[in-house]
């Protein structure tokens, strides 16, 4: 179709004349220029990924060279996905890579042992373009629900529960681990992002726009065209999409079976074993 045809066209590279001089910024009042937080290998639990085109290509190459194997299997797991997902979204959002560059690398990637993983990844490249184009024609979704009937919906969420959600201290282990993780690193896999929105809107009963800006500030890969549409879909205010209510305990048992992710980000309960670490309130007082 047209998307594949356009993405398959040659990558246009700028022609830089020899007369172009390198320019540097003057850091007034500073002995040393500020540095970007030190990056880490894909899958690490350190600070934010480093910016820049060179880092973008390092992630691009390492993904198709081997990390892609396991992409489909691990995409829903908060810990394993940190390595087997591409981690290219920040570089696309900030313009360090173009979608066409990624698409060309995808088409040239070796298929051996990764056919299904590559197919799953390729489908998501197209969805990225779909949501951005949709936002261009319906940009009001930044401010109001797609289905305006939800403007009249009442909510019972309290300021205290909203604050607890934003700070990662709701008392629900996987929810708190996910929020603390995204605050500290700027990254979280899709399913866990969806669960955070679901928990805010369905379990705590807050309107979708109570948390949309908070997560936008947290995401290193914030992309308006994707963020607002996905937030509304998970909050079930589009009126056309299936309503999905994520059970955070079930998600923890299925996606973080040994509790390693929760144990890392919620050290207060790191001493607990699985499966109790995902529902500590069920532990009898004598065993706590």
Regions found by a protein language model. Give the residues of each.
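Glycine/tryptophan-enriched, flexible segments
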Residues: 1-149, 255-256, 260-288
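Active-site-proximal binding-pocket segments
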Residues: 84-275
């Amino acid at each position: 179709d047209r998307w594949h045809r356009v993405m398959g066209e040659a990558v246009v590279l700028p022609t830089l004349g020899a007369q172009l001089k390198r320019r540097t910024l003057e850091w007034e009042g500073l002995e040393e220029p500020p540095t970007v937080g030190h990056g880490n290998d894909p899958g690490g639990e350190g600070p934010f990924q480093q910016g820049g085109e060179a880092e973008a290509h390092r992630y691009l190459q390492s993904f198709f060279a081997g990390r892609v194997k396991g992409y489909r299997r691990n995409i829903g797991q908060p810990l394993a996905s940190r390595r087997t997902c591409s981690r290219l979204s920040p570089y696309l959002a900030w313009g360090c890579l173009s979608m066409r560059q990624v698409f060309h690398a995808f088409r040239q990637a070796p298929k051996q042992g990764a056919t299904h993983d590559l197919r799953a990844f390729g489908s998501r490249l197209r969805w990225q373009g779909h949501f951005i184009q949709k936002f261009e024609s319906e940009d009001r979704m930044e401010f109001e629900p797609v289905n305006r009937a939800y403007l009249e919906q009442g909510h019972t969420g309290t300021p205290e529960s909203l604050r607890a959600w934003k700070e990662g201290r709701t008392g629900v282990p996987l929810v708190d681990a996910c929020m603390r993780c995204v605050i500290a690193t700027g990254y979280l896999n899709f399913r866990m992002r969806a669960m955070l929105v679901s928990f805010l809107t369905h379990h705590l009963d807050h309107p979708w726009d109570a948390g949309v800006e908070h997560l936008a500030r947290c995401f290193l890969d914030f992309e308006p065209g994707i963020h607002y549409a996905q937030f509304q879909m998970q909050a079930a205010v589009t009126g056309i999409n299936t309503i999905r209510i994520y059970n955070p305990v079930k998600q923890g048992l299925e996606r973080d079976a040994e509790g390693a992710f929760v144990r890392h980000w919620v050290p207060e309960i790191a001493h607990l074993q699985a499966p109790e670490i995902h529902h500590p309130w069920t532990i009898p007082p004598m065993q706590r």
